[in-house]
């Protein structure tokens, strides 16, 4: 009985289902080239690992990254924005908490060459199309009892843009990163965040390891 009580106190997310997306997407141009971004997936993986420690049943939707799957996490690998959309929308309905930490491409090539495109003398113009807005779709379709958390990476008017995204996407909480903060953001093992919720509460944190940032984010979600 003592052990059950101890683990119940430690496992604050026990019995809850949590989905987190992580990493970039790669939008192919031809068999060897793609449009991508610098996301490492480290923040999303840290969140998945911390959520499992708290007893959650975790599904991790991972873009193309070279990271080991945290113990106890169900991992679904995806490559493109369309893959990410399909995996996230296909799994969101049964989740209690949804954390969308992936950096999903906003645009993808209209045409994908079946063979490697050879270098030519002239310029190469690639026409792009908008990808499906996975965060917006989940925001439009989420149930009252589901908590939806998004991320914003901004370079100017950071808080104003984050508040706007919070409203547009029907989020409960948004985690703001700034490219202006040294040691934070893509590729780093540390991050510096500001968390904003629908009650207009704004909490800024110092630079920390992404493991400690994951603790701050999940603490905020639990107390929301």
Predicted regions and their residues:
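A glycine- and small/hydrophobic-rich beta-loop-beta segment
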Residues: 64, 72-136
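YjeF_N-associated NAD(P)HX repair module
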Residues: 1-19, 109-112, 177-181
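Short beta-strand segments
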Residues: 19-23, 100-102, 152, 177-178
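Generic hydrophobic/aromatic pocket-lining and core-packing "Φ" positions
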Residues: 32, 44, 48, 88, ...
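Glycine-rich phosphate/diphosphate-binding loop of Rossmann-like nucleotide-binding domains
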Residues: 12-80
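C-terminal alpha-helix
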Residues: 2-6, 91, 216, 220-224
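Glycine-rich phosphate/nucleotide-binding loop
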Residues: 109-206, 211, 215-219, 223-224
């Amino acid at each position: 009985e003592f052990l059950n009580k101890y683990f119940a106190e430690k496992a604050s997310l026990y019995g809850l289902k949590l989905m987190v997306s992580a990493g970039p997407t790669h939008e192919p141009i031809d068999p060897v080239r793609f449009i991508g971004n610098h996301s490492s997936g480290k923040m999303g993986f840290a969140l998945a690992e911390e959520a499992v420690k708290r007893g959650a049943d975790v599904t991790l939707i991972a873009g193309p990254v070279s990271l080991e799957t945290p113990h106890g996490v169900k991992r679904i690998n995806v490559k493109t924005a369309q893959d990410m959309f399909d995996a996230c929308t296909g799994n969101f309905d049964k989740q209690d908490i949804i954390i969308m930490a992936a950096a999903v491409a906003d645009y993808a090539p209209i045409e994908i060459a079946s063979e490697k495109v050879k270098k030519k003398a002239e310029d190469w113009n690639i026409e792009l199309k908008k990808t499906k807005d996975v965060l917006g779709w989940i925001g439009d379709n989420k149930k009252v009892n589901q908590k939806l958390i998004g991320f914003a990476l901004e370079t100017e008017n950071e808080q104003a843009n984050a508040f706007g995204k919070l409203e547009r996407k029907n989020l409960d909480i948004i985690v703001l990163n700034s490219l202006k903060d040294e040691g934070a953001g893509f590729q780093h093992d540390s991050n510096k965040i500001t968390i904003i919720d629908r009650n207009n509460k704004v909490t800024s944190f110092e630079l920390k390891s992404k493991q400690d940032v994951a603790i701050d984010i999940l603490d905020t979600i639990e107390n929301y």
